[in-house]
């Protein structure tokens, strides 16, 4: 996975998330939407709609009180916790 900041200001961040697919992007987007201060989260990886873009572009918008980079860090941490919880539960079940 490679990340490249496309655009950033106090309340919005757009980054390219190279090497990822819909599965990962949907999980990350869903967790971002549950994150305090995030007002919108979306991604685009459709070349026809994004001028030939083939890698996912993630856009995060916040209420302005939360830095979008901080929101992304929080969402990444929460996603990691969810995956660890699933792994622990699965391990106990089998």
Swiss-Prot record:
GO:BP terms for this protein?
A: DNA-templated transcription
- What Pfam families does this protein's entry cite? RNA_pol_L_2 (PF13656)
CDD domains according to UniProt: RNAP_L
GO molecular function annotations of the record: DNA binding; DNA-directed RNA polymerase activity; protein dimerization activity
Name of the protein this chain belongs to:
DNA-directed RNA polymerase subunit Rpo11
Q: Which SUPFAM superfamilies match?
A: RBP11-like subunits of RNA polymerase
Q: What is the lineage of its organism?
A: Archaea, Methanobacteriati, Methanobacteriota, Stenosarchaea group, Halobacteria
Keywords associated with the record: Cytoplasm, DNA-directed RNA polymerase, Nucleotidyltransferase, Transcription, Transferase
| Enzymatic reactions | RNA(n) + a ribonucleoside 5'-triphosphate = RNA(n+1) + diphosphate
Q: Where in the cell is it found?
A: Cytoplasm
Q: What does this protein do?
A: DNA-dependent RNA polymerase (RNAP) catalyzes the transcription of DNA into RNA using the four ribonucleoside triphosphates as substrates.
Gene for this chain: rpo11
Subunit structure, as described in the record:
Part of the RNA polymerase complex.
UniProt record similarity statement: Belongs to the archaeal Rpo11/eukaryotic RPB11/RPC19 RNA polymerase subunit family.
Spell out the InterPro entries in the cross-references: RBP11-like, RBP11-like_dimer, RNA_pol_Rpb11_13-16kDa_CS, Rpo11-like
Q: What does the record give as EC number?
A: 2.7.7.6
* Gene Ontology CC annotation, any one: DNA-directed RNA polymerase complex
Species of the source? Halobacterium salinarum (strain ATCC 700922 / JCM 11081 / NRC-1) (Halobacterium halobium)
